[in-house]
Regions:
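Surface-exposed beta-loop interaction hotspot
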Residues: 8-49
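Conserved small-residue-rich
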Residues: 34-78
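Generic detector of short alpha-helix boundary/capping microenvironments
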Residues: 28, 56, 75-77, 113, ...
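Short, low-order "capping/linker" segments at domain edges
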Residues: 25-34, 127-141
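Short, conserved secondary-structure transition motifs
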Residues: 21-23, 77-82, 122-133
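Short acidic, gly/pro-rich beta-turn/loop elements at beta-sheet edges
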Residues: 26, 50-52, 97-99, 135
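Short, well-ordered beta-strand segments in beta-rich or mixed alpha/beta enzyme
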Residues: 1-2, 34-43, 75-105, 139-141
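An amphipathic, aromatic/His-enriched active-site/gating alpha helix that lines ligand/cofactor pockets
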Residues: 1-20, 57-72, 90-129
Length: 141
């Protein structure tokens, strides 16, 4: 199913990409947990997609068990020859993201192999603030 988006008159849509979920998400609900969500866009060769999915699946239990983090979704471009993937991961905060750059050995091996199969990657970190989490934020104003 395609979703139609509307934009203000002064916003121009330059391109769109359709993706299908792979192993996750397990549910298709809007995310509501406050924290850091990193959107990691991958360019890959189409014949590497299945191995990247398997490597991710193998690494996630150890990775998630070692840090306050949870993989939200791994998506693949909805074409016959996919060359783009999107990984979305939740982190409690940026400190956890920084700590997770040094995962346990078995997760690290899978991530290193996944990196070898990746032509390039562009991670974008975002923060989701929910009204109930406002009291936990520190203002530097």
């Amino acid at each position: 199913t395609q979703t139609s988006l509307s934009f203000p008159d002064d916003v121009q849509l330059l391109s769109t990409h359709l993706f299908n979920p792979t192993l996750r998400p397990l549910d298709h609900q809007a995310r509501t947990r406050a924290g850091i969500y990193v959107f990691r866009w991958f360019s890959v060769l189409p014949d590497a997609v299945d191995e990247i999915i398997q490597l991710s699946y193998n690494a996630w239990p150890t990775f998630e068990g070692s840090f306050e983090t949870e993989v939200q979704g791994l998506f693949v471009e909805a074409t016959g020859q996919p060359s783009e993937m999107l990984l979305i991961t939740w982190y409690k905060n940026l400190s956890v993201w920084e700590e997770s750059r040094h995962p346990p050995e078995n997760a690290r091996e899978s991530f290193l192999r996944r990196h070898q199969l990746t032509l390039n990657a562009k991670p974008i970190a975002t923060m989701l603030n929910m009204p109930e989490s406002q009291s936990q934020l520190v203002s530097h104003a």
